[in-house]
Amino acid sequence: LGIAAFVAIGVGAGAAGMMCAAVAAQQGKRVVLIDHAAKLAEKIRISGGGRCNFTNINATPQNFLSENPHFCKSALSRYTPQDFLALVKKYRIGYHEKHKGQLFCNESAEQIIDMLKDECAAGGVHWRMPCKIDNVVQQVDGGFVLQTDSGDIETASIVIATGGLSIPKIGATDFAYRIAKQFDLAMV
């Protein structure tokens, strides 16, 4: 298939991966989203008993633990739970508050998945699913080549948004941990 070139690659087609890909693509970046699974967003699909606990309107930096306490302040000041709620309202997804600011879809988690897919489509995100990454090689110029079972992909940057190992039976893997180790990134 040759080498396909992208400005950014998102690895992991869950909530974080799709949101990141959508935002980058809508800002004019050429983005491809890769996942090893044939079906995207499995954790979204099962969250909240199938109704997706999609945000907590009371989330503050004090709700998060981090080696860098300012990270969460910065992240939440750039994109708040209210910003995500505005996106949900734009798509006319009915929701309700269940407990202490936790918001759930009235109908189905599929509505959030469809919303994120539509946001990716609006930016022209390319998809590679299922696609297994065999190796990540850093180039001399600072870019990367992802060697995959569907051909090599060249990129300036990679976002690893695979989540943790919380639910292996729905496809969670140690991919992010292996990449962190490969590039000597600290794990918390």
Tell me the role of every PLM-derived stretch.
Residues 88, 116, 180:
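Residue-level signal for inorganic ion chemistry
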Residues 6-33:
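N-terminal Rossmann-like FAD-binding beta1-loop-alpha1 element of flavoenzymes
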Residues 11, 46, 160-161:
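Redox-cofactor binding/interface segments in oxidoreductases and associated redox assembly factors
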Residues 25-49:
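Glycine-rich FAD pyrophosphate-binding loop
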Residues 122-188:
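Predominantly flavin-linked oxidoreductase catalytic cores and closely associated redox partners
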Residues 10, 14-16, 39, 164-166:
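Residue-level detector of alpha-helix initiation sites
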Residues 72-80, 99-118, 165-172:
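Short beta-strand to alpha-helix junction loop
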Residues 49-99:
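Glycine-rich active-site loop/strand segments that organize a redox cofactor
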